[in-house]
Design a protein with these regions (language model features):
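A short, surface-exposed alpha-helical micro-motif characterized by mixed small hydrophobic
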Residues: 220-222
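Conserved ABC transporter NBD signature motif
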Residues: 65-77
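Short catalytic/signature loops enriched in Gly
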Residues: 3-4, 144-147, 240-289
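A short, proline-enriched helix->beta-strand linker immediately N-terminal to the Walker B motif
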Residues: 172-176
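Conserved ABC ATPase "signature" region
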Residues: 74-77, 129-148
Length: 289
């Protein structure tokens, strides 16, 4: 039987700004099983990142707030947990990889210490134990000369190498859920492919469930088991990756797929555009998106 790791029910997230209340996420439902990859796709501003940040309340201290809904992680509702309990989860049971590896790493801290940090904090490793484990995982993610470069700083690495370090840090404690927020966007195509292959390989080894946020449908086809399509703060369609690609039901999903160029596209071929504009989430339309 498939083990349910995460279940989100009727999630509503809002941001209070001078102009009013931005209803960034409006009634989102989804689930995540052990060892699977769920891709969340949609255009910028559709609510992808806010949805996943809400899981561990990473927008707390900002103007964001969960208005309504359940976030069940192994049966416990994270939406009701206080900050001091969520801190124990972040980096241990639920980890996150962000889009830009340069801003994800502390530029004044040696990369080895950054990978060691969650092990010391969450696993109570000694420094010697943490260093041994950090070297193991840096070698696992394919960082060249990991032992020699353990005391190097982030600026001394390429973009792809920095992202490998970020992945190593996120996976150090073998989390049950890994949230990857457009982790390949800042990389070239060759490096994107390497990072995606690496994530799939590591997922098999530690059986982590992945939520992969992207607007790149090619990446989705490569990595996802299931897909959730977001538009206007709502998940308008979810399904198996083949169902979404070959039998989309929602007009927005169809438009998103149809706007993607293929190998037969030439410079003279007009690309399909979705008419209109995304809904104003200060004044969202009534009903479904």
């Amino acid at each position: 039987m498939t083990e349910r790791i995460l279940e989100v029910n009727d999630l509503h997230v809002s941001f209070d700004i001078t102009a009013g209340e931005v209803q960034a996420v409006r009634g989102v439902d989804f689930y995540l099983n052990k060892g699977e990859t769920l891709a969340i796709v949609g255009e910028s501003g559709s609510g992808k990142s806010v949805t996943t940040k809400a899981i561990t309340k990473l927008f707390q201290g900002d103007t964001g707030r969960i208005k309504k809904g359940e976030i069940l992680f192994l049966g416990e509702d994270l939406a009701k947990k206080p900050e001091n309990e969520l801190i124990k989860l972040r980096g241990k049971d639920i980890s996150m990889i962000f889009q830009d590896p340069m801003t994800s790493l502390n530029p004044t801290m040696q990369i080895g210490k950054q990978v060691m940090e969650p092990l010391i904090k969450h696993k109570n490793y000694s420094k010697a134990q943490a260093k041994k484990r950090a070297l193991e995982i840096l070698n696992l993610v394919g960082l060249p000369n990991a032992e020699k470069r353990f005391k190097a700083y982030p600026h001394q690495f390429s973009g792809g190498q920095r992202q490998r370090i970020v992945i190593a840090t996120a996976l150090a404690c073998e989390p049950k859920v890994l949230i990857a927020d457009e982790p390949t966007t800042a990389l070239d195509v060759t490096m994107q492919a390497q990072i995606l292959d690496l994530m799939k390989e590591l997922q098999k080894k530690i059986d982590t469930a992945i939520i992969f946020i992207t607007h790149d449908l090619g990446v989705v086809a490569n990595i996802a088991d299931r897909v959730a399509v977001m538009y206007g703060g709502q998940m308008v369609e979810t399904g198996d990756v083949n169902e979404i690609f070959y039998d989309p039901k929602h007009p927005y999903t169809w438009g998103l797929l149809s706007s993607m160029p293929d190998l037969s596209t030439t410079n003279d071929t007009p690309l399909l555009a979705i008419p209109g504009a995304p809904p104003d989430l200060l004044h969202p339309p009534k009903g479904d998106a």
